């Protein structure tokens, strides 16, 4: 889980204000942070299969949110993936 301070920072950066944590861009940023943190965890704990299930669920949720954002607002999609460096 991400702490509240980091969520506020991501909300300001991607959503415009610290209370805009429900914006799609902010949700994607939070999930990306969690995914990056779990990648580091799995480098040291290769046999942690139970956490891997949650990791895959987070990846799938982010994938769905990115697809939705791409359909709804393509410009915002492009800026989000460039800021997060998650696609080419």
Swiss-Prot record:
Keywords: Ribonucleoprotein, Ribosomal protein, RNA-binding, rRNA-binding
CC per GO annotation: cytosolic small ribosomal subunit
Xref: InterPro entries: Ribosomal_uS15 (IPR000589), Ribosomal_uS15_bac-type (IPR005290), uS15_NS1_RNA-bd_sf (IPR009068)
CDD domains for this protein: Ribosomal_S15p_S13e (cd00353)
Gene Ontology terms: biological process: translation
Organism domain of life: Bacteria
Any one GO MF annotation of this record: structural constituent of ribosome
PANTHER family, alphabetized: RIBOSOMAL PROTEIN S15, BACTERIAL AND ORGANELLAR, SMALL RIBOSOMAL SUBUNIT PROTEIN US15M
HAMAP family associated with the record: Ribosomal_uS15_B
Subunit and partners: Part of the 30S ribosomal subunit. Forms a bridge to the 50S subunit in the 70S ribosome, contacting the 23S rRNA.
Name used for this protein in its record: Small ribosomal subunit protein uS15
Species of the source: Mycoplasmopsis pulmonis (strain UAB CTIP)
């Amino acid at each position: 889980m991400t702490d509240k301070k980091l969520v506020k920072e991501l909300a300001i950066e991607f959503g415009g204000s610290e209370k805009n944590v429900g914006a799609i861009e902010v949700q994607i940023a939070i999930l990306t942070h969690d995914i990056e943190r779990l990648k580091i965890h799995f480098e040291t704990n290769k046999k942690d299969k139970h956490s891997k299930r949650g990791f895959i669920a987070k990846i799938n949720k982010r994938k769905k949110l990115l697809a939705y954002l791409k359909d709804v607002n393509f410009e915002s999609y492009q800026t989000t993936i460039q800021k997060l460096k998650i696609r080419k």
